[in-house]
Amino acid sequence: MEKYKLELNKESSKYLQIYNYIKKLIIDNKIKEHEKLPPIRKLANYMNVNNATIVKVYELLEKEGYVYKIVGSGTFVSNMKLKKEKNKYD
């Protein structure tokens, strides 16, 4: 959980700060492809934010193609090679 340590500031939305931070971890390969992200409640408690904030972050990451969800199993980092290929044609 240490890699998810983030000092939130009051200048911008918490969910955007967390989204950008996790996205950067994924892009920088600090969270590997197919690695499971922390459960929503656990990450929310760790970051001292509401569960809904993390839900919003995970939904945005999924919409942007950085993660995928498996019902009953969790949220996982997507294959970034496929994301890069997809972006070529967008």
Language model segments and positions:
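N-terminal basic, amphipathic alpha-helical segments
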Residues: 1-90
